[in-house]
């Protein structure tokens, strides 16, 4: 079931799309567009059945090709979509304690993509360098005692590589890896 993790720049707490758009006459068309985007692993533009709205989607994809999400915009056919918020996929190997990033996830997380490697970065580098808040401690417990099915949606206030404060929104899910 697709869930909403953000609306514009505002993080949402994994709201099922049917709940988030419960009164929208375009819900079915949006669900279809999301499904087609995931199946084709490419963004699309489609028109709603009444020809009054355009749905535009973009894939959020990990470097190994796995789809981590879909960004979606709905607007009038003659309206230009706003600039999409930058999003990036990141995968933590809870067994090895390492992270695999995309360039976008490094940028969103406040890292300098020109100086950070995308594979094999120590998980500990992602942790805030100060006293932890409760929600941050939950993520650390996810690493120390990995349990399948744990999902966390949150924001962290961090300092980026330029010394600027930023807020990073994220979703973390703990799922067992299957061997290919």
List each language-model region with its residue ranges.
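Charged, amphipathic alpha-helical stretches
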Residues: 1-23
């Amino acid at each position: 079931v697709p869930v909403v993790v953000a609306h514009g720049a505002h993080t949402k707490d994994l709201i099922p799309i049917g709940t988030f758009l419960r009164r929208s006459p375009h819900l079915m068309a949006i669900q279809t567009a999301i499904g087609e985007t995931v199946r084709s692993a490419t963004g699309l533009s489609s028109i709603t059945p009444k020809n009054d709205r355009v749905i535009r989607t973009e894939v959020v994809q990990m470097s190994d090709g796995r789809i981590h999400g879909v960004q979606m915009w709905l607007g009038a056919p003659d309206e230009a979509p706003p600039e999409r918020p930058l999003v990036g996929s990141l995968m933590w190997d809870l067994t090895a304690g390492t992270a695999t990033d995309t360039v976008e996830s490094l940028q969103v997380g406040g890292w300098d993509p020109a100086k950070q490697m995308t594979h094999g970065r120590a998980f500990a580098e992602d942790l805030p360098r100060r006293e932890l808040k409760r929600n941050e401690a939950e993520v650390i417990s996810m690493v120390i005692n990995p349990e399948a099915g744990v999902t966390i949606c949150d924001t962290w206030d961090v300092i980026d590589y330029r010394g600027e404060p930023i807020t990073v929104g994220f979703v973390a899910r703990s799922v067992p890896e299957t061997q290919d």
